[in-house]
């Protein structure tokens, strides 16, 4: 059964081994699916709750985020909104930086942020106190840079970090526990991070999601949002074995370090 979460009315539906498909609740028992990589979990929740699918939001083109769209559309046409990217094989309504995605009949609307780095066309949806950011920002971590540069990714993460602190962040994967192991390696004296690690361990032991996470917490525990903090800069420079200059270079060093971290 999906796990309900607060703010906006959002349900977490699990997919594959660690993906989350977020279902945004709308009036008249309608749901908006965010990044449905699989159709079956969404269909199961629609059947369980008697809800109907009102729309689909896509953050990027990776198969584990769009793989269920065609099957869901086979049950009936719904509005699909996502980035302009030829690797998304179905016809969708494309949006980009500065656009606003409105659902007047649902009383919902989201601002579109272009956040390149994980992929070049990656977008995020921000509205109603919630941020749906796909694989750009994770709790205590961030996505790998499959296409973008460290400067692009750092700029994207900085934009998300600077959204209102009470914003709840809904990302695409349950990576929090593993991310916290790295965060405490990069910043071992951060008591907020160690406290969060213990809380996440309890949640996961109870088979509960660690998400959503407020940006106010991410600013305190996520090393990839803290590249200007002296302790994080020093740890990155020590790992690189040389002085580092700008925050984007600190970020790039941290990301490369995390890529090899076990």
Q: Each predicted region: which residue ranges?
A:
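Divalent metal-coordination and catalytic microenvironments
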Residues: 24, 35, 60, 72, ...
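Active-site HxH/HxHxD metal-binding segment of metal-dependent hydrolases
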Residues: 16, 30-31, 38-113, 195, ...
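Active-site metal-binding loops of divalent metal-dependent hydrolases
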Residues: 36-38, 61, 85-86, 118-119, ...
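Accessory terminal helices/loops
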Residues: 158-168, 177-262
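Active-site-adjacent loop/tail segments of enzyme domains
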Residues: 141-167
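Conserved beta-strand hairpin/beta-sheet module of binuclear metal-dependent hydrolase folds
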Residues: 2-52, 123-137
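Core dinuclear metal-dependent hydrolase active-site scaffold
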Residues: 3, 23-25, 100-126, 131, ...
